[in-house]
Amino acid sequence: PHVSVIENIMMSPVKVLGEKRAEARQHAGMLLERVGLSHKANAYPAQLSGGQQQRVAIARALAMKPPVMLFDEPTSALDPEMVGEVLNVMRGLAQEGMTMMCVTHEMNFARDVADTIWFMDQGQILEKATPGTFFRAPQHARARRFLSDLLVH
């Protein structure tokens, strides 16, 4: 809460990776543009919406140049109108070839973006399938029940 958005994104590359501040600042600016927040570079976390904070968190993670991004319910705490902002950034990452593992209940997003769906229940992987197969013809009874409940409600 005491550093600006751009300083927040620069912090780990400078401290952990040893990047020069100027290089880290330039990269952070590019990442903010990538997540649609270049205009918020000098803002502080308290000045951002939940969706903006989540997109800054994505930019901060990308600043470390990871080979894989892990997302655990990235939209669960967001107001409905903010969900699309975050999902659009994640769609862009997928289109750019970023490997992502995402725990989500956003089934439309999973259907559109995933290469593989792993359906889990109580910590166990019950089914692994392509999105087309999973949503059309799930093999496990628990997966069928889950999808049926989604379609009913």
What are these regions (language model features)?
Residues 69-72:
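Catalytic Walker B motif of ABC-type/P-loop ATPase nucleotide-binding domains
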